[in-house]
Amino acid sequence: MTQNFTIRQARPEDDAARATLLAPTYGADAAGLAAEAADIRHHFRDFGDLAPGIVRLVAEDANGAILGALEATVRLYANGCESVGVMFLEGIAVAPSCRETGIAAALLAQLEDIAREAGITEIASDSRIDDAVGADFHLANGFSEAERVTCFVRKIDG
């Protein structure tokens, strides 16, 4: 099958399209995600378009339409990993009409190349415990289940 898309680093003008694709993955609204991307870019403007440790990739067709998006961060630790400094797949999404075309695999391959070039040896990810589709995606793309955890949050006043 001919690959009818290219993978590249996301640019600011991709924020709305990326947010539309990724919003269901994050259980968020697209406008909020696009605003968050702009806010991160503003806070890290001295570092160029991307904040340190944040990877944002898109799959784009010949007409410039965004068909898929991936976000990852470098974390010091991720559950189940053996190394310090782990690439963490925060979210990945492909337009419904473009699924099963190799876009997700190509996005993951590019992320792996970026991680390898940075000396990172593991990519981690997560999905909600009740998300069978997410679990199936990870397993089909070379991830193995490491552990199950319960997450907690403590708010800080002031």
PLM regions and their residue ranges:
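Hydrophobic pocket/interface hotspot
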Residues: R18-L22
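Hydrophobic adenine-recognition pocket in adenosine-nucleotide-binding enzymes
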Residues: A10, I92-V94, S127
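Conserved beta-strand-loop-alpha-helix junction that forms the acyl-donor binding cleft
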Residues: S125-G134, V153
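Acetyl-CoA-dependent GNAT
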Residues: F5, Q9-P12, P24-V84, E90, ...
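Conserved acetyl-CoA binding element of GNAT-fold acetyltransferases
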Residues: S83-P96, T150
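Conserved acetyl-CoA-binding loop of GNAT-fold acetyltransferases
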Residues: L139-R148
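Conserved acetyl-CoA-binding loop-helix of GNAT-fold acetyltransferases
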Residues: V94, E100-D113, A140
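Conserved GNAT acetyl-CoA-binding A-motif
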Residues: A115-S127
